[in-house]
Amino acid sequence: MAGHVSAVDDILAEYHGLEEQMADPALHNDPAAARRVGKRYSELQPIINVHRQLVQVRDDLEAAREMAHEDHEFAAEAERLEVELVELEEKLADLLAPRDEHDGDDIVMEIKAGAGGEEAALFAGDLLRMYQKYADKHGFIIEVLDSAESDLGGVKDITLSIRSRQPSRDGAWSQFKFEGGVHRVQRVPVTESQGRIQTSAAGVLVYPEPDEVEDVEIDEKEIRVDVYRSSGKGGQGVNTTDSAVRITHLPTGIVVTCQKERSQIQNRARAMQVLAARLQALQKEEADAEAAEGRASQIRTMDRSERIRTYNWPENRISDHRIGFKANNLDAVLNGELDDLFTALRAAERAERLEADN
């Protein structure tokens, strides 16, 4: 508990410092700095709120205990406050527990059809809609940066930006970070005339997005920028200028494309943001691998070559192989009902962090 008191004191000091910065009109002359301050402020707010409740309950409990000597009705009030005090202390401990430094970040997500041809692309489309529905229910904004459809309307490859509507302690990364990996589907494809169950797969890549591109060192000499005409379905909305942008990072071979925006300048800026996110993730993976000295990576940075989840259509079952989670509500999950699964994954991650911290 003494450690918690010290941690809260440090957070209170930081919080008051952030309040002073936000009250300074000069801060808003630098939008990037203002975003960083606002984001950190929102991350600390839940801790401050619980701490204030805790202080109030302690004061009320002390008063109730004193009054209980004269009025027995206050004895019952004291018992209620004791229970509330324990609950708040546990809540504060949970908020102060080690957590992923990127949990408040927005993300870049890529969904790619894997083995299985057209069926794999249709499944990738199912995953896309699942994430879109979850995002809608939880107030996240999804923006399509680049996409390629299959002949039957599936998804060959798509790049998304997923962000919070406003700064939050629990941003898009805290929810979607567990989705990186190979997702396997077992079902009868629409292209299968014999009614045989087949197995296909789609890959999902998830990267926390840096607050600013400048946060990641990118040498302009190490990138190649190509421009080309944006694809479209025809009609008046087709962009007939070379506004689409493809950026290749030569040292790593990472290729990023963006064609959503109407201008080449906007597409280049957005592509640079995606490149920064991918390079940041690559740097972290390399650092984690070096620190782990070959140990199996944890949930938050698991090996993307491994199958993480199976979606079994005939049995209406979803299985997450990392934590042994199984549920026979595949239809609900595909409709964006991912809360139970994400809660289980967060609990497993928290347990690993606490074990590593000890």
Swiss-Prot record:
Protein name, entry field: Peptide chain release factor 1
GO MF annotation: an example: translation release factor activity, codon specific
Location(s) in or outside the cell: Cytoplasm
Family: Belongs to the prokaryotic/mitochondrial release factor family.
Gene Ontology cellular component terms for the protein in this record: cytoplasm
SMART domains: PCRF (SM00937)
Lineage: Bacteria, Bacillati, Actinomycetota, Actinomycetes, Mycobacteriales
Keyword Protein biosynthesis (UniProt): yes
General function of this protein: Peptide chain release factor 1 directs the termination of translation in response to the peptide chain termination codons UAG and UAA.
Keyword tags: Cytoplasm, Methylation, Protein biosynthesis
Post-translational modification: Methylated by PrmC. Methylation increases the termination efficiency of RF1.
Top-level taxon of the source organism: Bacteria
N5-methylglutamine modification, residue list: Q236
